[in-house]
């Protein structure tokens, strides 16, 4: 009876909150069931919420036919993840995160090159986190060219950088809400438990985001719908990049409000029910960090707001229930396709990343800014009272506004080994940085990282039942860095081979094989580290070739004359029917189709 009364009250509140414009935008969501296509997801306790038509929307998981490689062959050991470069020597490296295609090609060309369905040209607003096992995981929303970010065709896609590897795995579908919008992700490592908060426009004022949690480094996930007592108001269904707990165990998660503001959600029951904290910052995409255990928070940015020519910052003394009047920060303001990020490091220092130039409105940094138009990283020993600000020596511009470098919708995180990771978006393509505090405090630019010497050691991991799960080799270099080096073999629980590859100083070389659980070959890579070329062949279950594509594995991007570790399609991509007859051939040059 209590639940019925609650539903009735909530429905009445929902109708009161709905504007004509919102009802029109939600017209496609008059059904009672939304199917969520994913792999190795299980339903949580809460899988329904009120809809806009006085109905209850049920979210139903639909299993994919195949488990993505991003959720396969994932080690659970955390010991190796603590190995890293010595802390007192500057360390800096940068690589591609995403391949071309799909990144910002003139038409949708990802599937032509063999990428998973749902990986479209626009991969943006990512959640990013370093897993307990040291892997880096990025979850972007992805929307097709010619469709808006709030379109129902938008998906969430995932990409993984395995600990000790130098190159990211190919992006694959994370989940796809059929007839619903997937937009803007946030990943948070909650002391070993990984939380994903995914936005999505126009589902319901009672569904401002969705939740997925993992306790095995992102191999499997539990999906759930947040429970709200009243309809959300003054919000945009876009999580940002900040989440944290208070000393009492309450969870806070940052989200965009309407217009140029941001706010915090709070859950006091491990993510089941949520309330809007009430306060609003002066800035869309604000990045937020606790300054103490008493409720003092610092919010900086993020876009579409400035104060005396600088990006605004706010202080809250009550966990975001209210915010003091904004003051100018020491950083330039941001605009469209730009977002800052802040975290507290293991050392206790704060680190903050941002751009210097407002791209869309073509506004340079205010007078007194000393870092020109560069992307910057800043570090503070005194809770943000003063900052050391340093330019990143390598950066790419926005994919269309190419005059100035940009981190796009940036996220910064720290790995168990102390390295600082930065993920960008909206570049051609997105980049991933690894660096340490010693580099920030130093005057070094790019650093030459030696791969000479080192000791190779064999490792293994077992399933809980004692069955061998993985065996691999890795090298620890004189500076402490750990990279995969030698043969890696992963096994299914029944003992059959799942995946096999050879690494050379963190780079995959020669043949790489990935098998289905029934023993059939799903795909094969052949890489040559002398020519820096690779061939990716995918197979039907009957053993016939499905797609074979050719790749440059040390490409030079369009906007910077510098080689990166990454993937750009170069040469033919041939498609076959299941009976072996040829279906299509696409010729790629520098990641784009020139002939088919």
Enumerate the predicted regions with their spans:
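Sec-dependent N-terminal signal peptides
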Residues: 4-13
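Glycine/tyrosine- and acidic-biased, solvent-exposed loop/turn segments at the edges of beta-strands
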Residues: 447-596
């Amino acid at each position: 009876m209590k639940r019925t009364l609650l539903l009735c009250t909530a429905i009445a509140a929902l109708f009161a909150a709905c504007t004509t414009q919102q009802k029109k935008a939600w017209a496609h969501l008059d059904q009672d069931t939304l199917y969520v296509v994913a792999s190795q997801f299980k339903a949580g306790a809460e899988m329904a919420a009120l809809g806009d038509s006085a109905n209850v929307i049920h979210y139903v998981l639909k299993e994919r036919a195949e488990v993505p490689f991003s959720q396969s062959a994932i080690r659970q050991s955390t010991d190796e993840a603590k190995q890293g470069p010595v802390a007192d020597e500057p360390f800096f490296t940068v690589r591609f995160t995403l391949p071309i295609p799909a990144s910002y090609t003139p038409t949708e060309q990802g599937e032509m090159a063999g990428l998973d369905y749902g990986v479209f040209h626009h991969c943006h607003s990512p959640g990013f986190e370093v897993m307990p096992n040291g892997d880096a995981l990025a979850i972007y929303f992805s929307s097709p060219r010619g469709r808006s970010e709030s379109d129902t065709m938008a998906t969430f896609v995932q990409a993984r950088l395995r600990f000790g590897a130098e190159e990211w795995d190919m992006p694959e579908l994370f989940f796809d809400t059929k007839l619903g919008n997937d937009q803007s992700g946030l990943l948070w490592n909650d002391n070993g438990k990984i939380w994903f908060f995914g936005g999505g426009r126009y589902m319901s004022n009672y569904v401002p985001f969705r939740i997925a949690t993992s306790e095995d480094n992102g191999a499997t996930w539990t999906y759930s719908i947040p429970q709200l007592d009243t309809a959300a108001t003054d919000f945009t269904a876009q999580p940002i990049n900040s989440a944290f707990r208070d000393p009492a165990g309450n969870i806070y998660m940052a989200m965009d409000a309407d217009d140029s503001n941001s706010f915090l959600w709070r859950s006091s029951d491990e993510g089941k029910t949520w309330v809007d904290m009430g306060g609003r910052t002066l800035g869309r995409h604000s990045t937020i960090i606790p300054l103490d255990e008493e409720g003092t928070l610092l919010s900086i940015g993020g876009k579409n707001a400035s104060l005396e020519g600088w990006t605004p910052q706010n202080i809250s003394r009550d966990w975001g229930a209210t915010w003091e009047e904004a003051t100018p920060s020491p950083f330039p303001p941001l605009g469209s396709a730009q977002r800052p990020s802040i975290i507290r490091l293991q050392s206790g220092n704060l680190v903050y990343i941002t751009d210097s130039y407002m791209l869309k409105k073509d506004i340079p940094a205010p007078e007194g800014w000393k870092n020109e138009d560069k992307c910057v990283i800043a570090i503070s020993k005194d809770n943000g009272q003063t900052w050391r600000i340093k330019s990143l020596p390598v950066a790419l511009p926005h994919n269309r506004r190419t005059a100035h470098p940009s981190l796009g919708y940036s996220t910064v995180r720290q790995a168990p080994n102390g390295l600082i990771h930065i993920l960008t978006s909206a570049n051609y393509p997105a980049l991933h940085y690894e660096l340490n505090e010693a580099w920030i405090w130093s005057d070094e630019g790019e650093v030459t990282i030696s791969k000479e010497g080192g000791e190779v050691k064999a490792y293994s991991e077992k399933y809980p039942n004692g069955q061998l799960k993985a065996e691999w080799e890795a090298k620890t270099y004189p500076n402490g860095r750990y990279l995969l080096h030698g043969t890696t073999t992963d096994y299914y629980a029944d003992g059959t081979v799942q995946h096999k590859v050879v690494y050379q100083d963190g780079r995959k070389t020669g043949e790489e094989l990935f098998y289905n659980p029934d023993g059939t070959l799903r795909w094969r890579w052949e890489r040559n580290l002398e020519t820096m070329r690779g061939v990716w062949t995918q197979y039907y279950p009957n053993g016939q070739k499905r797609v074979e594509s050719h790749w440059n594995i040390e490409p030079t991007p369009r906007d910077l004359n510098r080689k990166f570790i990454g993937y750009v399609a170069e040469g033919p991509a041939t498609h076959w029917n299941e009976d072996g007859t040829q279906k299509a051939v696409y010729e790629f040059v520098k990641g784009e189709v020139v002939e088919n």
